[in-house]
Design a protein with these regions (language model features):
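Alpha-helix C-terminal capping segments
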Residues: 1-2, 30-36, 54-57, 97, ...
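Residues at the C-termini of beta-strands that transition into short coil/loop
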Residues: 66-69, 166, 220-223
Length: 232
């Protein structure tokens, strides 16, 4: 008997542009795909942001949605898991020091965004517009600032983890509360995963490292994801 496949997707940078909304043509195609396949989402963003990016039509076609890296889980409109956490004061002080001393001087506000079970930290800030996000992303690609902060953080606070997420942020959470926790709900051999941050410092890595290489589709952007899906 053929094993049923569970298609697991990151959202930001995989199904959508970073912090942007889903392309309308891709959305139509993806809804049809979700009608005949088991589609599961796992994202660092909260429920409201995910719906803003994808639209309710896509969100509700999915079998299950793991928001906040699997700490806030929904099936349609029903919440089935909620695992909250608060950033310790000494950890926030350490991150504030990094914020104050970053050579990248542009600040837009909302540098700490509390989400269920995790915190997103951003040097440029979550209020950055598209151009400001691009400027920081280009700077980060040259300097690896986020990777360096994550590596130092993980040595300083071994009970916590920092992972690069999206174009400007770091996802921070207790050890074991990353995206990898969602695989406990599935037969690993049944999963095909699509994500853009599958590198060791990325927030998709906790999933990709647990799967066979042939079950991981490391995408460049949503166009690449769509192209791969057409040939699955």
């Amino acid at each position: 008997m053929k094993k049923e496949i569970n298609y697991l997707f990151d959202v930001d940078g995989t199904l959508t542009p970073s912090r942007g909304i889903m392309n309308s043509e891709f959305k139509k195609w993806f809804i049809n795909f979700a009608c005949v396949n088991n589609v599961i989402l796992v994202t660092g963003s909260d429920r409201n942001k995910t719906i803003e990016q994808l639209g309710e039509s896509v969100y509700k076609k999915c079998k299950r949605v793991y928001n906040c890296s699997g700490n806030d889980v929904y099936e349609k409109d029903t919440q089935i898991k909620y695992n909250d956490w608060e950033l310790p004061i000494d950890v926030k002080q350490w991150l504030n020091f990094k914020l104050e001393h970053s050579p990248f001087t542009l600040r837009t506000g909302l540098h700490f965004e509390n989400r269920t079970g995790m915190v997103n930290f951003s040097i440029v800030g979550r209020n950055a517009n598209t151009q400001e996000r691009k400027e920081y992303y280009e700077y980060d690609c040259k300097t690896n600032e986020r990777i360096k902060i994550a590596e130092a953080f993980n040595k300083k606070f071994p009970e916590l983890q920092a992972k690069v997420g999206g174009e400007t942020g770091l996802d921070i959470f207790p050890v074991g509360c990353d995206k990898g926790q969602v695989l406990k709900d599935y037969d690993i051999d049944s999963v095909k995963f699509f994500g853009d941050r599958c590198d060791p410092q990325g927030n998709d890595y906790p999933i990709s490292k647990l799967l066979k290489p042939t079950s991981v589709y490391h995408v460049k952007d949503w166009q690449h994801c769509w192209e791969l899906l057409k040939n699955v």
